[in-house]
From Swiss-Prot:
The gene is hemL. It catalyses: (S)-4-amino-5-oxopentanoate = 5-aminolevulinate. GO terms for biological process: chlorophyll biosynthetic process; protoporphyrinogen IX biosynthetic process. Keywords: Chlorophyll biosynthesis, Cytoplasm, Isomerase, Porphyrin biosynthesis, Pyridoxal phosphate. It holds the Pfam family Aminotran_3. SUPFAM superfamilies: PLP-dependent transferases (SSF53383). Belongs to the class-III pyridoxal-phosphate-dependent aminotransferase family. HemL subfamily. The keyword RNA-binding does not apply. It comes from the Bacteria. Homodimer. The modification N6-(pyridoxal phosphate)lysine is found at residue 269. One of its GO terms (cellular component) is cytoplasm. The keyword Nucleus does not apply. This is Glutamate-1-semialdehyde 2,1-aminomutase.
Length: 431
């Protein structure tokens, strides 16, 4: 068991000045218990905490570090920009054109793109744009899909898909809730009912084509195709939220992997290479409604700043030129098969979902295809599993409902270590 004396001291101090002691709730370890770990350094596939403990990192800053932490090409590019160019100007820069052009080349849906500072900004802006473009107010989202902390997304359906949304967080107005409708993931009929009951009122349907904040739940291809067809028929803007799965499950994201093209796409995480960046883009006809060429307002003081764009641009170039995806698939499949073998040896049959290098081991025997099936997990068992893995130097997300990210810099030795730790941790979970 790692000694966390310094982390515990820092957490107590942090709680005096920061709500809950953290700047994002999942970091507080409420789901798994114990002391939140304060990190001091990251290098490659590993992190070291303030107490000197080292961990193999399967969180990867919640997704961005597909190439590992402190990648030499990325850090060198950042250093060059920092020392020779600057951090921000609040003016157009040539690098904005370069990354925009690259995105149009690698993401199927993108004809024009606007850079922002976070995934939440991207999704909020995309929904506003869809409303402006269609002249409609309501949106459909899916239970269990996370689109950031914008008011429109913090809505959960009531007892059924036809009920009006109720705010899922204080501070979200009833008016906002009324304009957000929830459908069931992977269930096209639940969507059709909402569209029929709100004829000509739906501006957008927004979906994570690979849901990553209810564990990992892939959309079924026929479900996504049915959404695409329905949106085309009804004049609804289809938005793929690829903040997490974009550039992760394929270079062109889930839309490349599935072969289904949305009208708008939101991006984040990997596109920033570890620095705060988001983007939204799509059809030229829709994007031309964005100010200043159009009437849908969107702006940002630090949008397109050279430091963040440098990290993102270098990351995308490496992914394009080096094509780590076949090797990422091999590594993630090795873990999946190793975990399955371990469960077979122990007489367990928990569910694993995986798309490319993002995966989740669910502590349930029920196939996980949506929010309702995801919440059948045994959270106490996950907590015991988590702490056993942590004790063995494996850092996973401190929540059952998050993804496990494999990075390109993980070695076969790292993977074998993880499979061995999993065997021990599964037994700890059952104890």
């Amino acid at each position: 068991m790692p000694q966390l004396t310094r982390s515990a001291e820092l957490f107590e101090k942090a709680k005096q000045f920061i709500p809950g002691g953290v700047n994002s709730p999942v970091r507080a370890f409420k789901s798994v218990g114990g002391t939140p770990i304060f990190m001091a350094k990251g290098q490659g596939a590993y992190m070291t905490d303030v107490d000197g403990n080292t961990y193999l990192d399967y969180v990867g800053s919640w997704g961005p570090f597909i190439l590992g932490s402190m990648h030499p090409r990325i850090t060198a590019a950042i250093e060059n920009t920092l020392t020779k160019i600057g951090t921000s100007f609040g003016t157009p820069i040539e690098m904005e054109i370069e990354i925009a052009e690259l995105l149009t080349q690698i993401v199927p849906s993108i004809e024009m793109v606007r850079m922002v500072n976070s995934g939440t900004e991207a999704t909020m802006s995309a929904v506003r744009l869809a409303r402006g473009y269609t002249g409609r107010d309501k949106i459909i989202k899916f239970e269990g899909c996370y689109h950031g902390h914008g008011d429109s997304f913090l809505i959960k359906a009531g007892s059924g898909a036809l009920t009006l949304g109720a705010p899922d967080s204080p501070g979200v107005t009833k008016g906002t809730a009324n304009d957000t409708l929830n459908a069931k993931y992977n269930d096209i009929e639940s969507v059709r009912v909402l569209v029929k009951e709100n004829k000509d009122s739906i501006a957008a349907i927004i979906i994570e084509p690979v849901a990553g904040n209810t564990g990992v739940i892939p959309a079924k291809t026929d479900f996504l195709q049915a959404l695409r067809d329905l949106c085309t028929e009804e004049g609804i803007v289809l938005i793929f939220d690829e903040v997490m799965c974009g550039f992760r499950v394929a270079l062109g994201g889930a839309q490349e992997r599935y072969g289904i093209t949305p009208d708008l796409t939101t991006m984040g995480k990997i596109i920033g290479g570890g620095l705060p960046v988001g983007a939204f883009g799509g059809k030229r006809e829709i994007m031309q409604r964005v100010a200043p060429i159009g009437d849908v307002y969107q702006a940002g003081t630090l949008s397109g700043n050279p430091l963040a764009l440098t990290a993102g641009l270098e990351t995308l170039k490496i992914l394009r030129d080096d094509n780590p995806y076949p090797e990422l698939e091999r590594k993630a499949a090795f873990l999946e098969e190793g975990f399955r073998d371990n469960m077979n040896k122990l007489g367990l049959s928990y569910v694993q979902n995986r798309v490319g290098s993002m995966a989740c081991l669910f502590f349930t025997e029920t196939p996980v295809e949506n929010y309702d099936t995801a919440i059948t997990c045994d959270l106490k068992k996950y907590g015991k599993y988590y702490h056993s893995m942590l004790d063995q130097g494996i850092y996973l997300a401190p929540s059952q409902f998050e993804a496990m990210f494999t990075s390109a810099v993980m070695t076969d030795e790292d993977l074998e270590k993880t499979v061995k730790a999993n065997y021990v941790a599964l037994q700890a979970a059952e104890a």
